[in-house]
A protein has these predicted regions:
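Iron-sulfur cluster-binding electron-transfer modules in prokaryotic oxidoreductases
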Residues: 15-229
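C-type cytochrome heme c attachment motif
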Residues: 2-7
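Short functional micro-motifs and their immediate structural scaffolds
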Residues: 10
Length: 229
């Protein structure tokens, strides 16, 4: 069964509680009432890019599995010693994959889709779980769907949204929307393997920028992998 806030529209109270809490987070951020730790760990683009390099990735992974260092991290930064941390790869996936994969396949469009997919690999797919993206590509190619890898996209902005840093969310939106629009203009639909990243472009950004035609166009061409298949 679906679980959600019971007072969302069309309820007579029309209370969007999740976004009410988001407004509170944004106010806290504006008042500088957020931890520096949270400001750092939500800066995924510079942090992940710095770690996903030969030597550094291996050191970060070793540190994440070191009990003494995890205890120190809990004491210094408030990151629980038993909290799972992502494993980093020494080279981002977007630097390893070809730009176009399976482009020999015959394109078959449908009523809602073009039959070609541009994959927004996301921070997690690019730096932590590349196999997830590679498996998605294999499934799409198996079903006759040619794939393009979006090379220049930034973080979707969900970590900064949860922090309440709405200006940074807008900056990331401004960086990604042109990349997505270019792919759409070339006849591609957009897919991301991480549900929260899909949610940003299907729901959160359209709510934040209701009059933005490019955001609306990206929303119309953005799909969850299972929805697309």
């Amino acid at each position: 069964a679906e679980t959600k806030c019971p007072y969302l529209p069309p309820h007579e109270w029309a209370l969007d509680f999740p976004h009410l809490m988001l407004r509170a987070k944004a106010q806290n951020f504006e008042n500088k009432d957020t931890k520096w730790r949270d400001r750092i760990i939500t800066s995924t683009d510079p942090i992940f890019d710095a770690i996903s390099t030969p030597g550094i990735a291996q050191m970060a992974n070793a540190a994440a599995n070191s009990k003494p260092l995890r205890k120190a991290g809990q004491a210094l930064f408030g990151i629980h010693q038993d909290a799972p941390l992502p494993t980093f790869i020494p080279k981002p996936l977007t630097e390893s994959l070809e730009g176009y994969i399976g482009d020999h396949a015959q394109v078959t469009s449908s009523e809602k889709t073009t039959g070609k997919v541009a994959i927004f690999v996301t921070c997690y797919g690019d730096h932590n779980e590349p196999q997830m993206v590679e498996d998605l590509i294999a499934v799409l190619n198996h079903n006759g769907v040619p794939v393009k890898i979006l090379q220049d996209a930034k973080c979707c902005g969900m970590p900064k949204l949860e922090l309440g840093d709405l200006k940074k969310v807008e900056k990331m939106k401004d960086a990604n929307i042109p990349v997505f629009q270019q792919a759409i203009a070339e006849g591609y639909d957009i897919i991301a393997p991480i549900p929260s990243c899909v949610l940003m472009y299907k729901q959160e950004l359209p709510l934040m920028f209701p009059g933005h035609t490019d955001v609306a166009n990206v929303k119309a061409h953005f799909f969850d992998p299972f929805e697309y298949l």
